């Protein structure tokens, strides 16, 4: 089987994945697939660090703004959507470039979960609604009943495991159809932390507070509201924190999230990391991708 070559750009939040993805897409006739669990939601732009309108005009983006904030989204759905996007991009002779920091989503796609038959999406949604009615303890007990074990026990991962088990007949855990080049962006911890702090400040200047308040006033309990960037500001809206305290909490939680992202990518994926402050870093990455694709740079 001839595998489809794809480029995957990963790394901690605020490291510059979007800019690199657009640069590669423009140079190599590519299109971008978002691998971020929060960027699927419409109306949540600032807090999710979604590609701006200008950036989306510079390169075609897929899997952005495909869900309402009231809807849930899972790794299972991402795999299905990403496979369709990859097939579409390749059919038009273009290079799929996946950009994102949600390790679970990317690992699920790259490790070989392929949709064999036609999955009844209404059945998937109905099953998830049933699970949503259960307490955490009941969800964990259901894992035991089905003899399902997961490495790190939390509700979201437990529900994903139950979904995969429930619809196993429609899934083929086969050799992956993709040959990925996984590019990791990173740098010294303080460099990353400084970029995170600066990004949060820019987000607040660019409308994050208004976006978070809209979400808090209308949909405070939905899955989308649990993402980093929104829930940290909720205490400010009810007078439990000052804006400065909420901002500091957001920066701290984002730094912790970046650390978890790096741990995931290092332990679970074959990532070749490049320091973003290294000399000629963009050119080095471009050359690596061209080598992977068997291309020579045009003179």
Swiss-Prot record:
This is tRNA dimethylallyltransferase. The record marks 102 as: Interaction with substrate tRNA. Signal peptide: none annotated. It comes from the Bacteria. ATP binds at residues 11-18. Its EC number is 2.5.1.75. Substrate binds at residues 13-18. InterPro entries: Dimethylallyltransferase, IPT, P-loop_NTPase. One of its GO terms (molecular function) is ATP binding. The gene is miaA. SUPFAM superfamilies: P-loop containing nucleoside triphosphate hydrolases. Its cofactor is Mg(2+). Residues 36-39 are annotated as: Interaction with substrate tRNA. It catalyses: adenosine(37) in tRNA + dimethylallyl diphosphate = N(6)-dimethylallyladenosine(37) in tRNA + diphosphate. It comes from Streptococcus pyogenes serotype M6 (strain ATCC BAA-946 / MGAS10394). Belongs to the IPP transferase family. Monomer. Pfam families: IPPT. Keywords: ATP-binding, Magnesium, Nucleotide-binding, Transferase, tRNA processing. GO terms for biological process: tRNA modification.
């Amino acid at each position: 089987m001839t595998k489809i070559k794809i480029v995957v750009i990963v790394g901690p939040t605020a490291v510059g994945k979007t800019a690199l993805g657009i640069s590669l897409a423009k140079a190599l006739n590519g299109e971008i697939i978002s691998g971020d669990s929060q960027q699927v939601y419409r109306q949540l732009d600032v807090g999710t660090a979604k590609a701006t309108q200008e950036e989306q005009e510079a390169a075609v983006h897929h899997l952005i703004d495909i869900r309402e904030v009231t809807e849930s989204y899972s790794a299972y759905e991402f795999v299905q959507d990403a496979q369709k996007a990859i097939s579409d991009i390749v059919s038009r002779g273009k290079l799929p470039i996946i950009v994102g920091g949600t390790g679970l989503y990317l690992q699920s796609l790259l490790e070989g979960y392929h949709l064999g038959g036609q999955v009844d999406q209404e059945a998937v949604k109905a099953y998830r609604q049933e699970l949503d009615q259960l307490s955490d303890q009941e969800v964990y007990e259901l894992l035991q009943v089905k003899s399902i074990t997961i490495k790190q026990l939390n509700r979201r991962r437990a529900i994903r495991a139950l979904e995969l088990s429930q619809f196993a007949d429609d899934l083929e855990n086969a050799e992956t159809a993709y040959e990925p080049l996984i590019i990791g962006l990173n740098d010294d911890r303080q460099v990353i932390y400084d970029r995170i702090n600066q990004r949060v400040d820019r987000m607040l200047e660019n409308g994050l507070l208004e976006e978070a308040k809209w979400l808090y006033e209308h949909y405070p309990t939905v899955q989308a509201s649990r993402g980093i960037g929104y829930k940290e500001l909720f205490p400010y809206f009810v007078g439990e924190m000052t804006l400065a305290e909420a901002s500091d909490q957001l920066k701290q939680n984002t730094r912790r999230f970046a650390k978890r992202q790096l741990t995931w990518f290092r332990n679970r994926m074959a990532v070749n990391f490049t320091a973003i402050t290294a000399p000629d870093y963009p050119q080095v990455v471009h050359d690596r991708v061209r080598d992977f694709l068997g291309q020579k740079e045009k003179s």
